[in-house]
Design a protein with these regions (language model features):
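A glycine-rich (often HGG/GG-containing) alpha/beta subdomain
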Residues: 1-144, 148, 152
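Flexible nucleotide-interacting loop at or near the entrance of a catalytic core
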Residues: 140-178
């Protein structure tokens, strides 16, 4: 990814066929991309769901719920749009083909949204690890531990330990000097 912020997209809902599929677009061209698929400006306040028709040229993709998140209120710290479509394979494939046709947008790789959040200061490293553990948790105990990391409490604990160790170090150095 380098230093340039890219616009990325991915299916954010679970794998397989379902009633609803959520596709997330995040980056500087997210709003421009959705406006092109809508054939007009979204004109929706952030964090409100609106029902709109998506188009790829003259082909109707689907009627979908669209939610826009401004940079300051998104998970990634980038402009983000969530598209809630019907979950059929045909609709998902057609929508992905449409998104792939844009020049300044690419499919997200594993962890790309989290990387955006880390780079934008929305998450720290321990929260990133906690999120990965939360996503992969198979037991209740794993989930509880992952929640603690993800909540950021671990970072506060480490900072407290660091502060105490620095005080101990200073006291030892002072006692050696005298």
């Amino acid at each position: 990814m380098g230093n340039m912020v890219e616009t990325v997209f991915a299916k954010s809902s679970g794998a397989g066929v379902s009633a609803i599929c959520v596709i997330r677009i995040s980056g500087p061209d997210a709003l421009k991309t959705i406006n092109t698929l809508l054939k007009s400006d979204l004109k929706s306040p952030p964090r409100y769901a609106v029902l709109r028709t998506l188009w790829w040229g003259k082909v109707k993709l689907d009627q979908a719920l669209i939610i826009y998140f401004a940079k300051d209120s998104s998970f990634t710290g980038e402009e983000t749009v969530e598209i809630h479509l019907h979950g059929s394979k045909a609709i998902i494939d057609m929508t992905f083909n449409a998104l792939n046709s844009f020049e300044n947008i690419r499919p997200a790789g594993p962890g790309d949204f989290t990387l955006q959040a880390l780079k934008n200061g929305k998450l720290n490293l321990s929260q990133v690890e906690g999120l990965a553990n939360l996503i992969n948790a198979e037991t209740e105990a794993q989930k509880i531990l992952a929640d603690k990391l993800f909540s950021g409490n671990f970072n506060e604990t480490v900072e407290c330990w660091r502060s105490k160790l620095l005080n101990i170090k200073a006291n030892i150095e002072a006692s050696i000097d005298f």
